Regions:
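Bacterial N-terminal signal peptides
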Residues: 20-32
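N-terminal cleavable signal peptides for secretion/export
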Residues: 36-103, 119-127, 187, 192-194, ...
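Solvent-exposed helix/loop surface patches that form functional interfaces
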Residues: 44-46, 58, 127-221, 231
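Hydrophobic alpha-helical segments and helix pairs
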Residues: 98-148
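Gly/Pro-enriched, hydrophobic low-complexity segments
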Residues: 99-101, 105-116, 215-216, 222-239
């Protein structure tokens, strides 16, 4: 397993990164879920939330796409599971410049443990699938089979090993949702790792209190989180 330094290279919130739009989708999921009170996987079959996504860079803020996040009861390898799904498609200026149709799926056991995740990237003529399969050993070790491929060839086929909390990008939002925010204090930190290709990237959620958000003449009391990512691939992310 690769060693990672704990120097925070990037700190990000939704719509803060100009180079990787899928990161913005992930951050928006995190930010949007913070308006809910969290218990241990407080899920209901058939939950669905639709998002309008905006791309922000400096003073420019333009509509970037549409996303749908849904949860339903399902099965994975014959056992009951939660199926967590995110569909994204670009819109507005982004659609004209760089067409995107991305899908992310997770299967969680009822315990809960992340069992499987898949990200399917469809961007113009580019199509890529990232699959992660998680197996939990008695010693506390987690074995992760990472398989990345296009329609023509395999890009990555390797095993990752870790201990502690490990998720894909979408599964990390499920972890955030499972935290008990009622007893959370300002500055609380929750470290974890994100499995991406051959890498295990160190990250953490950082709680910075409640915030009132106004939208379409309505006010919402939300919980405000940052995600700190300790990897050079996210060095352009910023607050």
């Amino acid at each position: 397993m690769r060693e990672h330094s704990l120097r925070p290279i990037g700190t990000a919130v939704w719509a803060a990164c100009a180079s990787k739009l899928y990161i913005c989708v992930f951050f928006l999921c995190v930010a949007s879920l913070t308006s809910l009170r969290a218990q241990t996987l407080p899920l209901s079959h058939g939950e669905r939330v639709d998002y309008d996504l905006y791309f922000k860079w400096g003073l420019i803020m333009s509509k970037a796409g549409l996303a749908t996040l849904s949860v339903k009861e399902s099965e994975y390898q014959g056992a009951p599971s939660w199926h967590y799904n995110l569909l994204f498609r670009s819109a507005g200026v982004i659609e004209k410049v760089f067409r995107m149709r991305d899908t992310m799926d997770c299967h969680y056991s009822k315990e809960p443990r992340l069992l499987f995740s898949s990200k399917r990237t469809n961007e113009g003529d580019y199509y890529l699938v990232d699959n992660l399969q998680f197996e939990y050993q008695g010693s506390g070790r987690i074995d992760i089979h990472s398989h990345r491929h296009t329609l023509k060839e395999t890009k990555i086929d390797t095993m990752l090993m870790a201990k502690g909390r490990v998720f894909d990008m979408l599964g990390a939002t499920m972890y955030l949702r499972s935290l008990d925010w009622r007893t959370m204090s300002y500055g609380a930190e929750f470290p974890f790792m994100i499995a991406i290709g051959r890498e295990l990237v160190n990250a953490r959620f950082r709680y910075t209190g409640q915030q009132i958000v106004e939208h379409k003449e309505a006010k919402f009391r939300t919980r405000h989180f940052y995600i700190d990512i300790y990897d050079e691939a996210f060095s352009q992310a910023k607050e």
